[in-house]
């Protein structure tokens, strides 16, 4: 069974999908204690870590996993908000990038609002993709609508998926 670490876990929406697909949710990391309390209730066999992922010094304290999933805060990218290019939360994807470099997981999945793709004429999104590729991943992205997957709301999300280049070999 492949292990998963969930960054910016919230109460565990992404983790639930991975759990239902047969993955082992190893660790959830979030800076909001209330979110982790709910996560712990729903994922009794998983660890939680109340950490600020904006502090790269804490990344070494997170155990390695096969897959990293992350839903970084979206407020600075959202088309329903002020879309502030200088919002410090916009840089939190860098903690995912740093963890990829440190722990070398087989794959990652990052989820965010569709506004991420158009922020600053798409340049922010292009930079994020380049960074993930520079860490040794083949990266793809898709815009998905949650209503197409049984969720009773229309909610478009960007999913960025990376697979280690060396795993993409044809034998």
Where are the language model's segments positioned?
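Class I SAM-dependent methyltransferase "Motif I" SAM/SAH-binding loop
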Residues: 7-11
């Amino acid at each position: 069974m492949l292990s998963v670490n969930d960054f910016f876990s919230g109460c565990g929406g992404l983790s639930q999908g991975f759990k239902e697909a047969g993955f082992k949710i190893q660790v959830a990391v979030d800076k909001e204690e209330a979110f982790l309390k709910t996560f712990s209730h729903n994922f009794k066999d998983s660890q939680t870590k109340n950490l600020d992922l904006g502090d790269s010094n804490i990344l070494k304290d997170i155990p390695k996993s096969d897959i990293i999933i992350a839903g970084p805060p979206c407020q600075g990218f959202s088309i329903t908000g002020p879309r502030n290019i200088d919002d410090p939360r916009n840089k939190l994807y860098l903690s995912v990038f740093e963890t990829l470099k440190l722990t070398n997981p087989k794959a990652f999945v990052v989820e965010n609002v569709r506004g991420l793709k158009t922020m600053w004429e798409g340049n922010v999104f292009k930079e994020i993709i380049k960074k993930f590729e520079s860490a040794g991943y083949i990266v793809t992205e898709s815009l998905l609508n949650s209503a197409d997957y049984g969720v009773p709301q229309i909610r478009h999300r960007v999913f960025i998926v990376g697979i280690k280049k060396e795993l993409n070999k044809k034998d």
